[in-house]
């Protein structure tokens, strides 16, 4: 009874006085209508008491407003209290505690002992046993970031650092303590933890005394499978549960954790919730009670009121909330003291059990300048708007460094501040900021920011025995161990360091996850200038650095660096002198300087030395040096040289500045073998070369080298100067000096040399050393063996031994170097006098040229002329001819692939993918499929499949990687996988890329003949299997054969001797009815007689006549037309006519019969065949005038279907016919045609494209017969439109989309007539149009496509703004208005117009919002005039009183509430103004007087909608009893009023504005209006409700189709788990060819759809697979597939991908996938059956039979019958019916009582067999010895069959047999 009273307080609302009010709040907390009641009572008091009580009422109203504002105060640590229940989100999971994100940017902590009692008990057991328990999970295994949890505040305290700390508990005993056993009801959503595992389920601790909660195993299976990865639930596991059954008055409850039940759980009145036991996380249905600047007030569960602060509004709906709006909300918390219920409208909280998404932390710690304030909240903090539009929040404590200097005035909206992002709140999805100077200037904000080895400053906090604690940031502390307090060990560190001292430290180790920071104060380490080692990869041989000794052993010292990197100094490397006992010389903690000898990062091993090598001595000059001392050149010296002359082998040069002669061999000009001869060719006498290396001097001859690799080696000091420095394992850079049969000799820059034996020259088998290397080639060599006595060394050149680091980086460096050298050659060429050479130097790959075909060579390549200069050789290889028919003199557009700078040839391509390159933004590091287009010796050029961009990639990834077997060599046309390293072509014209694994290469199909298969041609495999036998058939021969397979457009026939023949669909019937499929007339296995009419060439699959010399090696083309089978038929073609000639014979307008081959989704056309060698295309727009057909052409057209088409003409290649199904394609005036939108131009109209390249334009005046505010809103690129052609002048189509034009039969009402000239206008006429522009003398107003009128300012508005610029703001271009024609001047072609309300009958075009822009003087003047005219003395007195106190009032429940929010109303857009204007027109038909602005009514509309107006104050509003705001009637708005006070325009708690008096005076005209009668108000109320209902029904109409991305966003927001909506959204983008957006939608869907909705997610995965298969690369498809397998049941994903491959006719890929499936899922019968069906569809019956045998071997015996029956069924449908019968018969002979098999056998025979066969089976089955129930089933089927197909006699016969069976059974029973 107590609960009942609590939920339903007795009695009505009553007036309360000040003393009672406080009492009521503390005692009768459940009456949540206190705010509304106060307002209502205040209003009644006002009307009853009159002016005498005004002052008292205003005080009460002000306190009420303050109380309302306090309810919206967001949570702070101070407002929390112990026992408060609150919804939280797991932010971090540590070993011993959880960090919980709470609403409004708060944070709390849950100790490991606060999970549940059972878990704590297990922990105690583990501690007692001192051994880990197997069934006890750690916190990271029980909780994951993002989980929503219900918490209770257990304590509020202060940490050691002086910070406020919130301790929370998840223990159900504490969270659900407010529930009693009697209060439990079915459907309640509770949280609990698993307390124990039972035989049939789990006991769950829900924390309710006297209640035992049980979760049946069956109900937990779905959760275990989806959430627990199949593992059983463990003690302590947190669950969201639904109460399913309640027994024994709550003593026992049965729970469910199913996803569907939990995610849709709603708290209802039937569950008897009250304020004491409302739990956070409950989802409730609510109704908006009030819309305020601080948030929303909601009614829910009938009697409760809650608040939604600005942080928890739905971001996508903010600004659209209105009173009485129905919403769903989630309870965040109920404050135990104030009893305020905090709610959230964020969609992610409205699905219980769904985890929150983790926010990106990439900007965490960023310092931001000039961040504008969005709003300020007194007791909470301030909101800010970041540059990317994201909302951010700073708590009050973070707005200044101290409370003393805090100034609230600095946080007015618009003020800017410098701040830093310190955290992200997952619960609020916003960034948390700090304005504290100490935090902004802090060197580090979090542990993640600190790198090992960094020098940091800190403050000493304390000194303990374990070390010194140092504060290095606001929330970070580090430890300095005792060993690191100084360079030497300190006994009394407290004497040197004191608490508060600032110290400089160097970071030794930082572990952000464990929040562990170790530092050192050793001076030598801190001040060291040597490089630091933070990982083993940093340790390069020869590197000198500082470290510290951590252990001294007898075998040496272990030295440690940073980040736990350490190495060993062996005993012999401790000193140059022998040290017998290291422990006496060295000590732990000693700082030492070491040099790295060797490092193996993979094994984390490092060898160090204390013996530091001194600088090498300078090289002595050779004894016989002939140069003077002052002019000596040292070996290894870098010099500049001048070319003197060229020789055969190199360049004679002079070393500058002393002109010492030297020789530079050709092979030493570059590291790239191919570039040496190129540089040698273009260098000439006088050229200067820089940075040339002196290699050797002998007999006065200086040998030079210009190889960059060798130059870098010498500069870096990595070249050993003498043999003593050589040791095994060293990696050196040198060049091939000579090549022998037994190996190659390698020389190094210093003159040292070694032998690389044949055995270790390469990882590949070496047959000939000269195949692998050439003299002078740059190589990397690893020393394997050293003979110090003979000073010889053995080297390895194997790639596995000579790794130079990351292969991708090396590959890119080699490519960069090669291209830079080529660019240098171009520079040399540009200095030549020849115009040809200069032109070649300027040409780069990717450039486009318009050329003329000069000659087609025998090899199929094409030579072009017409280049930029004469004599320029431009060639396209046969491959780059792209199968095009070219003739001399033809003009072609080509793209340059490469310029051969040695042969002076330009390689070009005709490939359309390259010529029509797509402009798409590329990402660095992205992977792409590419096709090799050109090969050079060092690099290859490939084109990206998606865009056609040209990219270069190196053919080698190592200096030694020069040998390739033939099978490894790339070929032109081959597919490769590339990773882009640049996104812009640069000076080379090429993108730079690195090739992926060789396994991703794909081979191109070989085409040995110049006649190539059409790019869209798909060859029947039946015509390509095996070798085509030579035959002796000739024209006119009659042959007999058996139908082998049937395809949509042809039938394959097997003739005698295994010869394969083909019958085209056009040669089956003489008269083909439209819509039929002729090939279906023939059945597989049927014997046919045909006549030979031609043949198909096996190489090109092109049709050949009999007379062709290659006819004997062709597939005979046959005909079974009755007319051609007649004797004496001689009309056969015996001479050769090419398809191009045949196509010329077709005339435009001619009607032909064609056969649909397929619908090309990508290119949007139907591919058809007219004859075996004549193909055609029908653009989608020419298939129908019906939008339904164009939207789903696959439903209208079937493959193989015969179509009647009209010839349009040959296409551009002259090899195909263009056809139309809509009659002759003539774009002439008066015609109606279908087009596709290609561009939408704001305020102008559309650009529409038609088939075959025609373009037209549609003006905004021709979009519809009725103009609209947003005429272009429904149009997006790629949308299909029905157009009427107005004119075709100047080859530009002028179009109209008006229904009266495109569908005149509908007799569409023309609201806005067409205005094409001034002749169409009459004086006095009312016309609508669009604002054109604002000019000094008036407003130009567009009345038609070419007609513009002028409205002078005196005829624009009754208002006269002081600034004319305000017209631009309030009359934007394109705004729809109504105007009256005042005067026409036909001579000057001038139309004068008026917008005034008196002329148009419409509201003033300058809305109330403009009034706010006028100066205060103008407002006062206008108001004074109104007061004089109307003489409202009473109103004047009232306004004077209000003006005196206006400054004190913040918000009033009646009219006074408008005052502080007036500026907000002024800021609203034109849309609200227009709505209010149209509203006034409906409600009050009297025209306004000039002095009355629309702002008054606008404000009335707004604030009445917010429940803050009195009905008696305006004639617009009806009079009604004020019960509660939810019952206030709505105005008749044309569309739902949008509350525009969203996150962008929140009014914070600022001092009230000074316009109160003005606001009050604005309302006077309303107070003076005549009151309406009660009947009028009731009628008006009914109209308003009907109008609102109509709008709501329209918005809720499930049949309403989305037409924009915003529509789809709304839909998926309302139904986030509906895959159908997501797929429609993807299809919407695909129709607009927005592939990336479609991908993004799919990825968004996968993130949004709940993981419990497995099927919905799978649907999206399948759609994404389809998308990648159709528009992506094989690599992108594979990646998506691998992800899909990871997140779904693998078998389903495999089967879906196989179907996708099969449907897209990628049969090879499908076959390979099926074989993978057979290995992985051999026990799944579905895989075998699907593979069998696939093979049968491909006419591979024999392979299908083998699959059946394999299936029977792999599958268990119990599955055999089902599999055999299914294969037999497939044989019936797709293969040989006779074989199917045999399989069924064999199966039924073994299993005669398998009635399911009998039933399938009967079904198949009915479909594919004869009536005799069916009756035979029925006769057999009704004589079987089966159960009577089964027999009844078969008798019934037999009877139904005879009724449908038999005679009355047959029916009676079946009945007689049934009766006979019944009698026989009865007699047996009687016996």
From Swiss-Prot:
GO terms for molecular function: NF-kappaB binding; RNA binding. InterPro entries: HAT, NA-bd_OB-fold, Rrp5, Rrp5_S1_rpt_hs11_sc8, Rrp5_S1_rpt_hs1_sc1, S1_domain, Suf, TPR-like_helical_dom_sf. Keywords: Acetylation, Isopeptide bond, Nucleus, Phosphoprotein, Repeat, rRNA processing, Ubl conjugation. GO terms for biological process: rRNA processing. Residues 1-62, 998-1018, 1395-1531, 1549-1586 are annotated as: Disordered. HAT repeats lie at residues 1599-1631, 1705-1737, 1775-1807, 1809-1844. The modification N-acetylalanine is found at residue 2. The modification Phosphoserine is found at residues 7, 438, 1360, 1362, 1476, 1493, 1498. Residues 43-59 have a biased composition (Basic residues). Coiled coil: none annotated. Residues 83-171, 187-258, 281-346, 365-436, 453-522, 542-611, 636-707, 729-798, 1036-1109, 1149-1222, 1230-1298, 1324-1396 form the S1 motif domain. The keyword Cell membrane does not apply. SMART domains: HAT, S1. It is found in: Nucleus, Nucleolus. Residues 1416-1459, 1469-1484, 1575-1586 have a biased composition (Basic and acidic residues). The keyword Thylakoid does not apply. GO terms for cellular component: cytosol; nucleolus; nucleoplasm; nucleus; small-subunit processome. Interacts with NF-kappa-B p50/NFKB1 and NF-kappa-B p65/RELA. Essential for the generation of mature 18S rRNA, specifically necessary for cleavages at sites A0, 1 and 2 of the 47S precursor. Directly interacts with U3 snoRNA. Involved in the biogenesis of rRNA. This is Protein RRP5 homolog. It comes from Homo sapiens (Human).
């Amino acid at each position: 009874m107590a609960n009942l009273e609590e939920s339903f307080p007795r009695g009505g609302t009553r007036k309360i006085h000040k003393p009672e009010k406080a009492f009521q709040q503390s005692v009768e907390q459940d009456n949540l209508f206190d705010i509304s009641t106060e307002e209502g009572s205040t209003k009644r008091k006002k009307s009853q008491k009159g002016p005498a009580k005004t002052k008292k009422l205003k005080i009460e109203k002000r306190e009420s407003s303050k109380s309302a504002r306090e309810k919206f105060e967001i949570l702070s640590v101070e407002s929390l209290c112990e026992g408060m229940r609150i919804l939280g989100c797991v932010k971090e999971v540590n070993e011993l505690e959880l960090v919980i994100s709470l609403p409004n940017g708060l944070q709390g902590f849950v100790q490991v002992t606060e999970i549940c009692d059972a878990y704590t008990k297990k922990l105690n057991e583990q501690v007692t046993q001192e051994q880990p328990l197997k069934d006890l999970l750690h916190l990271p295994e029980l909780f994951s970031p993002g989980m929503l949890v219900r918490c209770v505040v257990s304590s509020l305290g202060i940490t050691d650092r002086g910070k406020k700390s919130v301790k929370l508990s998840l223990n159900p005993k504490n969270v659900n303590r407010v529930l009693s056993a009697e209060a439990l009801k079915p459907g309640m959503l509770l949280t609990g933890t698993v307390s124990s595992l039972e035989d049939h389920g789990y006991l769950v601790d829900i924390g309710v005394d006297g209640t035992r909660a049980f979760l049946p195993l069956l109900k937990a299976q779905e959760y275990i499978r989806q959430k627990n990865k199949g593992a059983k639930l463990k003690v302590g596991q947190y669950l969201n549960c639904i109460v399913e059954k309640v027994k024994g008055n709550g003593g026992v409850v049965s729970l469910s954790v199913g996803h569907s039940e939990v995610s849709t759980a709603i708290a209802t009145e039937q569950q008897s919730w009250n304020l004491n036991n409302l739990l956070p996380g409950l989802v409730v249905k609510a109704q908006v009670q009030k819309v305020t600047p601080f948030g929303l007030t909601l009614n829910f569960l009938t009697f409760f009121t809650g608040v939604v602060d600005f942080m928890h509004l739905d971001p996508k709906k903010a600004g659209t909330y209105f009173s009485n709006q129905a919403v769903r909300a989630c309870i965040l918390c109920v404050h135990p003291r104030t009893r305020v219920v905090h709610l959230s409208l964020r969609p992610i909280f409205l699905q219980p059990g769904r985890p929150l998404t983790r926010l990106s932390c990439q900007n965490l710690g960023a310092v931001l300048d000039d961040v504008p304030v969005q709003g300020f909240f007194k007791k909470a903090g301030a909101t800010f708007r970041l540059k990317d539009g994201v909302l951010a929040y700073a708590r009050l404590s973070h707005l200044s460094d101290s409370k003393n200097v805090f100034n609230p005035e600095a946080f007015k909206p618009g003020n800017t501040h410098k701040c830093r992002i310190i955290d992200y709140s997952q619960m609020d999805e916003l960034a948390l900021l700090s304005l504290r100077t100490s935090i902004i200037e802090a060197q580090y904000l979090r542990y993640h920011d600190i790198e090992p080895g960094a020098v940091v400053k800190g403050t000493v906090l304390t000194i303990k025995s374990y070390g010194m604690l140092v504060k290095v940031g606001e929330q970070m502390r580090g430890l300095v161990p005792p060993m690191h307090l100084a360079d030497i060990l300190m006994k009394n560190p407290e004497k040197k360091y004191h608490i508060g001292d600032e110290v400089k430290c160097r970071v030794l180790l930082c572990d952000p996850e464990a929040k562990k920071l170790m530092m050192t104060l050793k001076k030598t380490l801190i001040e060291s200038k040597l490089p630091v080692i933070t990982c083993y990869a940093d340790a390069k041989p020869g590197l000198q650095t500082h470290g510290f000794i951590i252990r001294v052993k007898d075998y040496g010292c272990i030295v440690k660096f940073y980040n736990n990197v350490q190495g060993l100094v062996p005993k012999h490397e401790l000193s140059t002198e022998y040290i017998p006992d290291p422990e006496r010389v060295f000590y732990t903690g000693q700082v030492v300087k070491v040099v790295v000898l060797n490092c193996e990062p993979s094994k984390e091993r490092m060898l160090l030395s204390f013996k530091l090598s001194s600088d090498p001595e300078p090289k002595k000059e050779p004894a016989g040096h002939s140069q003077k001392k002052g002019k000596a050149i040292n070996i290894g010296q870098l010099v500049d040289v001048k070319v003197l002359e060229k020789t055969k082998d190199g360049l004679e040069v002079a070393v500058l500045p002393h002109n010492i002669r030297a020789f530079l061999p050709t092979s030493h000009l570059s590291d790239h073998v191919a570039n040496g001869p190129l540089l040698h060719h273009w260098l000439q006498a006088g050229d200067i070369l820089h940075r040339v290396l002196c290699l050797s001097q002998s007999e006065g001859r200086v040998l030079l080298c210009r190889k960059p690799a060798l130059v870098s080696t010498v500069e870096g000091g990595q070249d050993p100067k003498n043999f003593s420095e050589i040791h095994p394992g060293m990696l050196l850079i040198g060049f091939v000096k000579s090549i022998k049969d037994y190996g190659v000799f390698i020389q190094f820059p210093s003159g040292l040399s070694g032998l690389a034996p044949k055995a270790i020259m390469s990882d590949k088998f070496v047959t000939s050393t000269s195949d692998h290397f050439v003299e002078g080639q740059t190589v990397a060599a690893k020393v394997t063996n050293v003979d110090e006595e003979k000073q010889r060394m053995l080297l390895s050149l194997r790639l596995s031994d000579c790794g130079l680091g990351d292969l991708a980086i090396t590959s890119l460096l080699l490519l960069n170097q090669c291209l830079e050298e080529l660019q240098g050659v171009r520079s040399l060429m540009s200095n030549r006098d020849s115009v040809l050479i200069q032109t070649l130097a300027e040409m780069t790959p990717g450039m486009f040229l318009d050329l003329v075909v000069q000659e087609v060579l025998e090899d199929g390549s094409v030579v072009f002329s017409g280049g930029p200069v004469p004599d320029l050789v431009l060639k396209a290889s046969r491959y780059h001819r792209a199968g095009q028919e070219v003739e001399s003199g033809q003009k072609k557009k080509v793209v340059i692939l490469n310029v051969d700078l040695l042969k002076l040839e330009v390689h070009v391509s005709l490939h359309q993918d390259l010529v029509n390159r797509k402009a798409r933004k590329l990402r660095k590091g992205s992977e792409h499929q590419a096709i090799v287009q050109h090969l050079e010796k060092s690099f290859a050029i490939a084109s990206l499949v998606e865009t056609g961009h040209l990219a270069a990639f190196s053919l080698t990834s190592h200096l030694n990687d020069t040998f390739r077997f033939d099978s490894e060599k790339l070929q032109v046309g081959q597919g490769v996988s590339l990773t882009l390293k640049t996104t812009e072509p640069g000076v080379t014209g090429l993108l730079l890329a690195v090739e992926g694994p060789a396994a991703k290469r794909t081979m191109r199909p070989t085409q040995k003949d110049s006649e190539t298969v059409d790019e869209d041609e798909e060859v029947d495999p039946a015509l390509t299997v095996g070798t085509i036998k030579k035959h002796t058939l000739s024209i006119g021969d009659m042959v007999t054969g058996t139908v082998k397979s049937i395809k949509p457009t042809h039938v394959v026939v097997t003739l005698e001797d295994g010869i394969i023949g083909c019958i085209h669909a056009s040669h089956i019937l003489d008269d083909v009815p439209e819509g039929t499929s002729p090939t279906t007339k023939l059945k597989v296995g049927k014997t046919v007689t045909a006549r030979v009419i031609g043949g198909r060439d096996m190489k090109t699959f092109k049709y050949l006549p009999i007379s062709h010399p290659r006819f004997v090696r062709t597939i005979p083309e046959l005909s079974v037309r009755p007319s051609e089978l007649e004797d004496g038929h001689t009309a056969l073609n015996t001479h050769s006519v090419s398809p191009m000639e045949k196509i010329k014979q077709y005339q435009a307008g001619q009607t032909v019969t064609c056969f649909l081959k397929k619908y090309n989704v990508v290119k949007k056309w139907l591919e058809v065949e007219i004859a075996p060698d004549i193909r055609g295309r029908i653009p989608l727009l020419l298939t129908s005038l019906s939008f339904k057909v164009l939207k789903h052409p696959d439903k209208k057209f079937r493959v193989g279907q015969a179509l009647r088409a009209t010839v349009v003409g040959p296409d551009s290649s002259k090899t195909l016919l263009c056809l139309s199904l809509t009659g002759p394609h003539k774009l002439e005036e008066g015609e109606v045609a279908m087009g596709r939108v290609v561009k939408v131009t704001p305020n102008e109209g559309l650009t529409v494209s038609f088939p075959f390249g025609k373009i037209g334009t549609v003006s905004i005046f021709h979009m519809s017969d009725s103009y609209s505010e947003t005429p272009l809103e429904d149009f997006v690129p790629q949308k299909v439109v029905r157009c009427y052609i107005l004119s075709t002048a100047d080859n530009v189509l002028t179009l109209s989309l008006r229904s009266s034009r495109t569908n005149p039969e509908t007799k569409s009402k023309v609201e806005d007539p067409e205005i094409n000239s001034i002749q169409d206008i009459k004086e006095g006429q009312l016309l609508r149009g669009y604002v054109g522009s604002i000019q000094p003398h008036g407003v130009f107003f567009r009345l038609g496509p070419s007609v513009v009128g002028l409205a002078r300012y005196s005829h624009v508005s009754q208002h006269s703004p002081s600034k004319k610029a305000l017209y631009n703001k309030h009359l934007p271009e394109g705004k729809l208005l109504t105007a009256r024609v005042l005067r026409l001047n036909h001579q000057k072609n001038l139309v004068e117009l008026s917008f005034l309300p008196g002329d148009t009958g419409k509201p003033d075009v300058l809305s109330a919002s403009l009034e706010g822009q006028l100066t205060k003087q103008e407002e006062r003047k206008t108001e004074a005039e109104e007061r004089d005219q109307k003489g409202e003395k009473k109103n004047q007195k009232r306004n004077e009183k209000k003006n005196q106190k206006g400054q004190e009032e913040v918000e009033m429940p009646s009219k006074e509430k408008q005052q502080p929010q007036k500026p907000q109303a002024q800021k609203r857009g034109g849309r609200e103004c227009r709505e209010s204007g149209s509203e006034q027109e409906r409600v009050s038909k009297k025209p306004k007087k000039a002095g009355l602005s629309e702002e008054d009514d606008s404000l009335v509309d707004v604030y009445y909608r917010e429940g803050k107006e009195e009905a008696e104050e305006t004639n617009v509003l009806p009079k009604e009893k004020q019960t509660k705001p939810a019952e206030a009637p709505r105005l008749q708005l044309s569309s739902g009023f949008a509350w525009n006070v969203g996150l962008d325009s929140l009014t914070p708690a600022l001092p009230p504005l000074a316009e109160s008096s003005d606001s009050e005076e604005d309302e006077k005209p309303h107070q003076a209006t005549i009151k309406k009668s009660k009947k009028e108000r009731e009628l008006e109320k009914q109209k308003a409700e009907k109008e609102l209902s109509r709008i709501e029904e329209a918005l809720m109409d499930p049949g309403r189709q989305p037409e924009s991305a915003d529509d789809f966003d709304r839909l998926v927001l309302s139904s986030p788990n509906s895959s159908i909506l997501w797929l429609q959204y993807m299809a919407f983008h695909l129709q607009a060819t927005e592939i990336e957006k479609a991908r993004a939608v799919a990825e968004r869907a996968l993130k949004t759809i709940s993981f419990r909705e497995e099927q919905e997610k799978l649907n999206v995965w399948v759609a994404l697979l389809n998308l990648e298969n159709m528009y992506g690369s094989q690599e992108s498809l594979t990646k998506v597939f691998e992800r899909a397998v990871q997140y779904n049941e693998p078998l389903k994903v495999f089967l879906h991908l196989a179907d996708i491959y099969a449907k897209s006719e990628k049969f090879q890929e499908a076959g390979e996938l099926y074989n993978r499936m057979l290995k992985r899922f051999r026990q799944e019968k579905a895989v075998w059956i699907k593979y069998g069906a696939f093979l049968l569809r491909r006419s591979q019956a024999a392979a299908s039979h083998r699959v059946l045998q394999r299936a029977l071997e792999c599958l268990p015996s119990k599955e055999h019958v089902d599999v055999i029956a299914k294969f037999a069924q497939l044989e019936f449908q797709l293969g040989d019916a006779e074989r199917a019968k045999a399989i069924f018969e064999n199966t039924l002979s073994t299993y005669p009582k398998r009635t399911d098999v009998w039933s399938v056998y009967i079904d198949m025979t009915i479909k594919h067999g004869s009536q005799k066969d069916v009756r035979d089976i029925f006769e057999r089955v009704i004589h079987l010895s089966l159960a009577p129930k089964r027999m009844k089933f078969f008798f019934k089927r037999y009877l139904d069959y005879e009724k449908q197909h038999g005679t009355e006699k047959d029916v009676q016969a079946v009945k007689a047999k049934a009766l006979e069976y019944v009698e026989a059974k009865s007699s047996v029973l009687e016996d």
